[in-house]
């Protein structure tokens, strides 16, 4: 087939219309119902005008160079063209449905399940809901791609499922229900419970719990067994609307029906309780989770800690974490850095250190941020020696500090006449791979100058010289002169060296 302007104009002019059904009118049961009374305003992707233009010529060349001849066109080769040539094209991506429709008009071509599924997903992903509706109408009004004599086929479910999901995400619940009912008739069987869950979740996200519950009840009438996801969706809906009694009733119903709650079920309830200030109920639910043998997740711990801290109960959060540790249910990946930050913010750095050491001792290695936060908290609260001891421990464990935290700690040690301890930390850090900078050396030299330790200071100045940290000889002489006059300067003068 040779592409020309007439072909292109014909293709584009039909870009919004699938070909007429290829079979006589079907019984009403197979027809998709009329759309909801009020059609939403849908923005249709721009198309080429019907008058010849340079764009037509470019599109002709594009099709001639990339689309297989119509006599050899198969669903697989068409899909290859749509995926590799059209899908990400900056100018022609929105013509995929037009090409899809054109192929359906060829006598030698018949779409299969894969091509319908790909087109359904493409239209859904790009929010072309009008075209998606037309595609589903065509599927409903024509025989199954399997055979021209089949109108009911379970393989049609994935085609409709992608559309239902897109409608639910866009809060177009009338269209989602329409597609669901049509799919249910066409597959001549019971849809997968996941499709029911999609519709239930759509109603919940739209804030319509009444319709969500009615659809859940419909599942029972249609003998579709709800799974844990079904209950989690509804529980989440009740929690979002602060109907915790109903959420707990559904939680109990879930267990009565033999559906075991999972970590998402508990997390949803715990988050709901804590966000509404029901601290005791949330913590109680967490301990019930332990009793039922449901594994704690990192998210569970974060929900509990954040909820308690938000209510100003930082000590309770700390105690809860340690209790979970003792019960051996605290996840190894739990990051308690935020709790350390809260404790330090309330001037409880020592409490934070005790908690961290207890966690560390039992295998809960702290992260870099938690360590530096604690060092800063101890330093700012005047507990320089404890900060130094913790810094030494973290470096021995291979956790190296950042230069700002490290230099500030050395400065505080030198200010309290512990320059030797500060230099010992520098040597330890260097042995672990940390590279001291100019600020590190200046802080230590100033500390030794103030304490009258000329020899130690000269060693550091010479190291600076060897590492090219001194910009000129004048700086070197100034530092050495300062060391030679140790004890003769005031503290302010030493800081100026």
Swiss-Prot record:
A Pfam family this chain is assigned to: PPR
Keyword Repeat recorded: yes
Keyword 4Fe-4S applies: no
SUPFAM superfamilies, A to Z: HCP-like
Alphabetic keyword roster: Repeat
PPR repeats: 156-186, 192-226, 227-261, 262-296, 297-331, 332-366, 367-401, 402-436, 437-471
Protein family membership: Belongs to the PPR family. P subfamily.
PANTHER family: PENTATRICOPEPTIDE REPEAT-CONTAINING PROTEIN 3, MITOCHONDRIAL
Protein name: Pentatricopeptide repeat-containing protein At2g36240
């Amino acid at each position: 087939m040779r592409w020309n302007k007439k072909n292109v104009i014909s293709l584009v002019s039909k870009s919004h219309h699938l070909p007429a059904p290829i079979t006589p009118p079907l019984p009403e049961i197979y027809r998709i119902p009329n759309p909801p009374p009020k059609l939403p305003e849908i923005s249709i992707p721009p198309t080429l005008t019907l008058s010849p233009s340079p764009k037509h010529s470019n599109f002709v060349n594009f099709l001639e160079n990339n689309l297989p001849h119509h006599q050899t066109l198969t669903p697989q080769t068409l899909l290859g063209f749509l995926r590799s040539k059209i899908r990400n094209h900056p100018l022609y991506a929105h013509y995929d449905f037009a090409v899809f429709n054109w192929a359906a008009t060829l006598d030698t071509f018949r779409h299969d399940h894969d091509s319908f599924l790909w087109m359904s997903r493409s239209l859904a992903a790009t929010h072309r809901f009008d075209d998606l509706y037309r595609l589903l109408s065509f599927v409903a009004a024509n025989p199954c791609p399997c055979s021209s004599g089949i109108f009911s086929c379970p393989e049609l479910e994935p085609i409709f499922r992608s559309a239902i999901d897109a409608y639910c995400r866009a809060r177009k619940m009338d269209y989602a229900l329409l597609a669901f009912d049509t799919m249910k008739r066409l597959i001549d069987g019971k849809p997968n419970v996941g499709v029911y869950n999609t519709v239930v979740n759509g109603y919940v996200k739209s804030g319509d719990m009444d319709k969500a519950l009615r659809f859940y009840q419909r599942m029972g009438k249609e003998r579709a067994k709800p799974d844990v996801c079904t209950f989690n969706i509804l529980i989440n809906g009740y929690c979002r609307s602060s109907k915790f009694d109903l959420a707990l009733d559904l939680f109990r119903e879930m267990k009565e029906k033999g559906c075991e709650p999972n970590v998402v079920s508990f997390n949803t309830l715990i988050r709901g309780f804590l966000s509404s200030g029901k601290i005791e109920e949330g913590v109680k639910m967490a301990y019930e989770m332990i009793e039922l043998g449901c594994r704690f997740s990192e998210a569970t711990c974060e929900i509990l800690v954040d909820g308690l801290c938000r209510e100003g109960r930082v000590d309770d959060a700390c105690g809860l974490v340690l209790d979970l540790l003792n019960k051996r249910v605290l996840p190894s990946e739990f990051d308690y850095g935020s709790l350390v930050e809260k404790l330090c913010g309330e001037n409880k750095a020592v409490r934070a250190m005790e908690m961290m050491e207890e966690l560390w001792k039992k295998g809960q290695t702290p992260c870099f941020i938690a360590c530096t936060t604690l060092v800063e908290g101890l330093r700012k609260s005047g507990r320089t020696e404890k900060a130094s001891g913790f810094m030494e421990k973290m470096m021995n464990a291979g956790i190296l500090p950042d230069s700002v935290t490290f230099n500030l700690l050395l400065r505080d040690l030198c200010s309290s006449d512990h320059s030797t301890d500060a230099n010992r930390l520098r040597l330890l850090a260097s042995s672990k791979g940390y590279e001291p900078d100019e600020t590190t050396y200046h802080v230590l030299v100033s500390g030794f100058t103030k304490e009258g330790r000329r020899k130690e200071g000269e060693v550091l100045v010479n190291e600076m010289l060897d590492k090219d940290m001194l910009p000129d000889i004048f700086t070197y002489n100034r530092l050495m002169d300062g060391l030679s006059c140790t004890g003769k300067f005031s503290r302010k003068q030493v800081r100026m060296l």
